[in-house]
Amino acid sequence: MHNVQDIYADEPIMLQFDLPKNGLIVVGDLHGDLYCLLNILLKNGFPPNAKYLFLGDYVDRGLYQVQLILFIFLMKLRWPNYITTLKGNHEDYQCGKEYDFYNECLSMFKRGSRWFTQINHVFDHMPVCAIISNQSIISHSDHFFVCHGGISQWMTCRSNVGNIPKPTYTSNMHFVEGVILADLLWADPKLEQQKWFDLSRRNCGYSFNRDALNIVLRALKVKTLIRGHEYYPGGTTRNFGDDTCYTVHSTTDHQELYDPFCKFLIASQ
């Protein structure tokens, strides 16, 4: 556990890297669905034959929460340059207590409370977003901004995001840094919303419309937002009907029957 935490501690809060020539497999919310993860890996290949980026929400709700997150940690240890994992809103101490990840740890381990605390220490060292360049395109802008939730009205430049401190204990942050972090983990796009930014129905973070997204994308010098956080029956969706915002949710809705066709997005040149 300490070894994988050390890897994350060396990574910046906002990753920046080039899009692989053979593409990048983007995996959305898994929520303890180990079968879904294995299906995606079997379909696309294990590293180093493929590179993966995970959008967060590995725990809570599913049947194999502990097994899934430990498996992802093992993959990160084995292939650190081929596995990128971002923090989601459920990778949080309080959220894990309110849902069922804490109880899963208690049932799995003799000292479950310690395991829960240690895993959350690892979560707090994870990066929360990434900027991905497409070197095959000559442009003054990078291609993708990737996070779990969405954008913030305070994201006026990249340094506003890159200066968020790790580990991500909000008590160690300035107010604006905490607000940006909350939006990165909790924000949602809303097609019919009139205001650029409005209070989220989730009681944390803000929702944003197309105009707000375009302004923030220009400020960050990127063209497309890729995010998770929301379930859609098709697994992926273009939130505004164009290429400015994609949502990826890999596991099925846990209120529905088991769906063997796990969803993912391939970001390619």
Identify the meaning behind each predicted range.
Residues 1-269:
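Feature recognizes metal-dependent phosphohydrolase scaffolds
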